[in-house]
């Protein structure tokens, strides 16, 4: 059952839905956001943490820019590196926060894609393929088959205070390893979507 957004939140989904470039994309977004609300209480989490609306808007914009239309995402295999988890905590307050949940993978599921989430946090119970992985371990992504993804998304991993605190001087080595793995894992003609929000073919 698709939920409806509470009255005070109607401007939030409307702003996100408006990103869709076609009527078809806007209808697809409306359904996807409704499902995210029903399954993951998106509207109440946005009410508690307003920055989540900006994060969702950014994700929708990235996907639209990368694929040209949201309907083109259906059936695509997408790897989300450091996808976030329900166990994530704010690096500032130390409290659990909805902002770092696996929203991109959840959105991709609702748009008909086949996401694979990679994170060090707990992803148990999520409706997409996921793997708990420490990206600081050399060869951490070797288990994934070469050329198996149409797109790879990585958002804010290397700017994360948590990541820098955990890996310190190894951060640049890890960045080089992840970039090498991205080239190996991406299918010819696939797209990389990095934290600057721009697709890189």
Across the structure, where does each feature detected by a protein language model lie?
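Class I SAM-dependent methyltransferase Rossmann-like catalytic core
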Residues: 13-72
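Class I SAM-dependent methyltransferase SAM/SAH-binding core
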Residues: 79, 84-139
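Short "lid" loop at the C-terminus of a central beta-strand within the Rossmann-like core
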Residues: 84, 159, 197-201
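A short helix->loop->beta-strand "cap" motif at the edges of active sites that frequently abuts
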Residues: 111-113, 187-190
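A short acidic, Gly/Pro-enriched loop at the edge of an enzyme's catalytic core
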Residues: 139-152
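A short SAM/SAH-binding and catalytic strip from SAM-dependent methyltransferases
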Residues: 150-172
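A short glycine-rich, Lys/Arg-flanked "PGG" loop and its adjoining helix->strand segment in the class I
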Residues: 168-188
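Conserved beta-strand signature within the Rossmann-like core of class I S-adenosyl-L-methionine
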Residues: 189-197
